[in-house]
Amino acid sequence: MSESRQKLHPLLVHVARSFGHFLVPRKPSCLLVAVSGGADSLALLYAAHELAPDFGVCACAVTVDHSLRAQEGALDARFVRALCARFSPPLPCFVQQISAGAVHACAKIRGRGVQDAARALRYKVFDHVAARCGAQVVLTAHTRDDQYETLLMRLFQGAAASALQGIRAARGRYVRPLLKVSRTCVEDFLQTRGVRWREDASNTCRKYVRNRIRHELIPALDAVLAGWRSGLDKTFAGISAEHSFCVAALTRWREGCSHAWEPVPRALGTRLRMPRSDFLAAEFILRFFLLQEACVRLGVSHRVPRGALERCARFDGVRRIHVSGLQLERAGAYVLFSCIHASDTARETKKQDAGSPPSSEKQGVSAIYVARPGAYPCACGTLLVEVRPAGVFVCCAQDHVGVGPFSFPFYIRTHRTGDTISIRGGHKGIRKMFSEWHVPLSDRTVLPMIEQDGVLRALYGAALGYQNRYAERTPHE
């Protein structure tokens, strides 16, 4: 790269360093740049176009219309294609459209929101286009601002140390050359070249946590504590070092354990097992890391809350734990670990009652139709439905008293946004009740509730060691 080009702009220098570090060893012939039309991705596209000849590679672009923003997504794609055509020589541009409704369908399956689903489908498109055009490396335009937003979001979500490593500069075929570049630097780079970019209206929507962090939290931090980024860098560097130490300790521990996480096939997927004595003898933090490893081996697709893994790590070797779709239980001399998907629960329920109506399941909510006594696998573990002289009661192995009475049929389900339950003098929101009881997020998503005739009749808190809340029927119900 020429000396004059180094002086043009700091962004170009950062990208050149990234290319030297990640591209030279791989010796790719083609780079695929993911471009949305926004400032970050356009800056990366221009930088890649300028630097590609110096590294002996060609560059091409891919842009994706997610079919989420009416005509705006199509206009973004058209803008990117026209811009690529103006380069000299013109850059090949692959315009891909995700079919209408596909993102929402994916979000329902993954249970992690529309933005997560859009990202998952977008990366599938990138992989497909990379294979089609022969690109060995895909460049994405994550910036230093994205890094801090991600770290803050994960920090407040109680993420594990592995997630607090932040966005990686490279993973597989994906390289992120702008991770040390600020958004201010990006915009300055484009302005020096007279390049205009498009703004995605969804980036200002406050319903998304990342946007609230970007537009509300970070400006507040800047106003109150100007050097917070430097302090955060040091904190996360320390976390990273401690995480590396724990990984090394786990490796040494595994060398002395000959049967760590053996697969055990079953009808509804695979479980993993290890000797109970080995698991219980491990330090708490090693158990935590073992469970993280097990989640990876089982291909758990949803983000598991840290609290859920910590609860499993406190397994006493006797009582089964079922939280956030994970299950840890004793099986003779072994402990069994499995991921219970909503689809698994639905299939089990279908087997128990082939004639039952469809579940009232909504996005993020599991619901089981109950029309007879028996054992029902739920998000918190197996619940027992018993017929007693006073009526039908729901209980579990840890709580034989249970909650009730009810009458058949009814649903056992998890929390739904807006849930309220009848109390003296009116109704009370379940979310407020969770806050008053100090229920962690990992338990809120699995605490069982009983719904009958469209009315929430009970919150069965005793299933996880909390109070019960039972709503008597009113005369006009």
From Swiss-Prot:
GO terms for molecular function: ATP binding; tRNA(Ile)-lysidine synthase activity. One of its GO terms (biological process) is tRNA modification. GO terms for cellular component: cytoplasm. Its main location: cytoplasm. Pfam families: ATP_bind_3 (PF01171). It catalyses: cytidine(34) in tRNA(Ile2) + L-lysine + ATP = lysidine(34) in tRNA(Ile2) + AMP + diphosphate + H(+). Its EC number is 6.3.4.19. ATP binds at residues 36-41. It is an enzyme of class 6 (ligase). It is found in: Cytoplasm. Keywords: ATP-binding, Cytoplasm, Ligase, Nucleotide-binding, tRNA processing. Ligates lysine onto the cytidine present at position 34 of the AUA codon-specific tRNA(Ile) that contains the anticodon CAU, in an ATP-dependent manner. Cytidine is converted to lysidine, thus changing the amino acid specificity of the tRNA from methionine to isoleucine. Belongs to the tRNA(Ile)-lysidine synthase family. The N-terminal region contains the highly conserved SGGXDS motif, predicted to be a P-loop motif involved in ATP binding. This is tRNA(Ile)-lysidine synthase. It comes from Treponema pallidum (strain Nichols).
